Curated annotation (Swiss-Prot):
It comes from the Eukaryota. Disulfide bonds: none annotated. This is Sperm microtubule inner protein 11. InterPro entries: SPMIP11. It holds the Pfam family SPMIP11.
Length: 131
């Protein structure tokens, strides 16, 4: 922020300011709780593991936990994350079906320039090898 002549503002929390706020704020003050609150993670993965370490390990192994940046942050933090913000959160839907413009037709070359070079060199010299 020095280029705006703003100094001594402390550290800027760029990632923290972009993160989704999962905690719900209440204005009313609750009474003092008589028991401990249930252990529920703030990232929304509780329904997957339900406080079971074995289920958590299985979810990590099968990649069932929230891992995409669009599930953690409100806006893309870096330019590399722009693609994941276009993705659909519906499980089982391929990106080509949800976003048809990312699929383009393939126009392959049957005889590429390298293939033509190798064929021509092999016809002229039977001992020709690329290696």
């Amino acid at each position: 922020m020095a280029f705006f002549n703003l100094y001594l503002l402390g550290y800027q929390h760029y990632f923290q300011s972009k993160k989704r706020n999962t905690a719900q704020e209440t204005n009313q003050k609750d009474e003092v709780p008589t028991r401990l609150p249930p252990i529920i993670s703030e990232d929304g993965n509780y329904s997957v593991h339900q406080n079971s370490h074995e289920r958590y390990q299985e979810a990590v192994r099968k990649v069932l936990l929230k891992t995409f940046p669009n599930q953690v942050f409100r806006v893309p933090v870096t330019d590399a994350q722009n693609f994941s913000f276009w993705r659909s959160n519906i499980p089982g839907v391929r990106p080509e079906k949800a976003i048809p413009w990312i699929k383009t037709p393939h126009h392959c070359l049957i005889k590429s320039p390298m293939t033509r070079f190798v064929d021509h060199s092999h016809l002229n010299d039977k001992t020709f090898s690329l290696y």
